[in-house]
A protein has these predicted regions:
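Hydrophobic h-region of N-terminal signal peptides that target proteins for export
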Residues: 13-22
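N-terminal secretory signal peptides that target proteins for export/translocation
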Residues: 1-5
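Catalytic-site microenvironment of enzymes
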Residues: 6-9, 22-168
Length: 168
């Protein structure tokens, strides 16, 4: 299963970098993720005009989340859910101490607000990404859904990558 996770992580980097073919030796690629989207139609539409493979990270509790996700998908951009995590607030936010079934409900509701999400990244989330049990559950859930996770690395104590690698 470690090989499966490595494959999924490799696939993630290829998707985000927009690599359609093998990269020549020595050539570097950079992935760009713009987050906090879904709040302002004017600002959000400007991000769609950016050239190349730019990933749009959309917050589920914003007024234009669903519409912008559809627009971004139609424009050929990769869409991801910008999942609110502690200390973020709101109806979708994850906080330490919330039961897994409630975290699952919030994830399901957030994904419903951001159609075409190919994966998720954490909005804030320093305390949440340091929690082993929720991160282990999340990595397993994302694997079942064929979604990826990009850790915003808002904390040196994050266990997200370690839990993703432990999936067997």
């Amino acid at each position: 299963m470690i090989h499966t996770m490595r494959y999924l992580l490799c696939l993630l980097f290829c998707l985000l970098a927009g690599v359609a073919q093998a990269a020549p030796a020595g050539k570097a690629y950079m992935s760009i993720i713009i987050d906090d989207l879904g709040q302002s139609p004017d600002r959000d539409s400007r991000t769609l005009a950016l050239p190349g493979p730019v990933t749009m990270a959309i917050m589920p509790d914003t007024p234009h989340a669903s519409d912008f996700a559809r627009q971004a998908h139609k424009a050929g951009k990769t869409v991801i859910l910008h999942m609110p995590m502690d200390p973020a607030t709101g109806p979708y936010a994850w906080h330490p101490g919330i039961a897994i079934d409630e975290l699952a409900r919030r994830l399901e509701a957030a994904l419903a607000k951001v159609p075409y999400a190919a994966g998720i990244n954490n909005h804030m989330g320093s305390r949440m990404t340091a929690q082993r049990e929720p991160m282990a559950w999340l990595m397993g859930e994302l694997q079942q859904r064929h979604l990826f996770f990009v850790d915003s690395r808002t904390s040196a104590a994050t266990v997200a990558a370690a839990e993703a690698q432990r999936i067997s």
